Amino acid sequence: MTNKIDWQAFADATIDILVKPAIGDTVLIITDTEDQTELPVTCLKAALRAGADAQLLVKHHIDRKALSTPGPVLSDAILASKFIVDFCGGIVRAPATIEARSRGSRLLSTYVNDIEDYVNRALLNIDYEAMIRNADLVAKLWDNTNYCHVTSPQGTDINFKL
């Protein structure tokens, strides 16, 4: 992360709005040796302030496009965590992550390098609760629909059964 950004508000929003751990929930924050640690450490502090049982794990760097097979330490940490906050990639399709998610763990994965200003503004300048309300309304609409016909002024004309 090359820009000097105060990550405190971003970390607080990430933990308080997106992750929302209850007191005692396990939160694993993962970064790697190629990334700056300021944001992951700030998120760790925010998770601890929220009362979570939070840990920060720094793993070896793997190319973002490569499939990672984490070793036993990282795999066990992933499996033991209710919330996984990944800042470096390489674990989304890992067997431990897939198993953890099938058991109910939640994964928040992002890579902010080179887009720091954008992600900071994007998270801090939105009405997240309104987005959730709108998503719930759309979900309710889809749940009560058998057939959909979508058109737009740009020429979209799609029909499908649900």
Feature annotation, model-predicted:
Residues 1-162:
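Active-site bordering "gate/hinge" segments
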